């Protein structure tokens, strides 16, 4: 799957789950489970409940995603 197949949406972290997983509420009201991307994990980017994040979703499974950016 190439990067062009995925799309990004903005959301807010609603809950922190084990193993660096997060429950994110998207702007359209949907709730997805998301994990941190590799570059964010490598650079020790901390994500807390209430943070605004950008989530990358695939058209194959819209209930899971990858957090690619945390707004300041």
UniProtKB/Swiss-Prot annotation:
Which compartments does it reside in? Cytoplasm
- Matches recorded under InterPro entries: NA-bd_OB-fold, RNA-binding_domain_S1_IF1, S1_domain, TIF_IF1
Cystine crosslinks: none
Question: Superkingdom of the source?
Answer: Bacteria
Where does this chain mainly localize?
A: cytoplasm
Q: Annotated Gene Ontology MF terms?
A: ribosome binding; rRNA binding; translation initiation factor activity
Record-linked Pfam families: eIF-1a
Where, if anywhere, are coiled coils annotated?
none
For this UniProt record, the keywords arranged alphabetically read as follows:
Cytoplasm, Initiation factor, Protein biosynthesis, RNA-binding, rRNA-binding
Could you tell me which CDD domains the record lists for this protein?
S1_IF1 (cd04451)
A GO cellular component annotation in the UniProt record: cytosol
The record's function comment reads: One of the essential components for the initiation of protein synthesis. Stabilizes the binding of IF-2 and IF-3 on the 30S subunit to which N-formylmethionyl-tRNA(fMet) subsequently binds. Helps modulate mRNA selection, yielding the 30S pre-initiation complex (PIC). Upon addition of the 50S ribosomal subunit IF-1, IF-2 and IF-3 are released leaving the mature 70S translation initiation complex.
Instruction: Report the family membership.
Output: Belongs to the IF-1 family.
Q: How does it assemble?
A: Component of the 30S ribosomal translation pre-initiation complex which assembles on the 30S ribosome in the order IF-2 and IF-3, IF-1 and N-formylmethionyl-tRNA(fMet); mRNA recruitment can occur at any time during PIC assembly.
The name under which this protein is listed is Translation initiation factor IF-1
Gene of this entry: infA
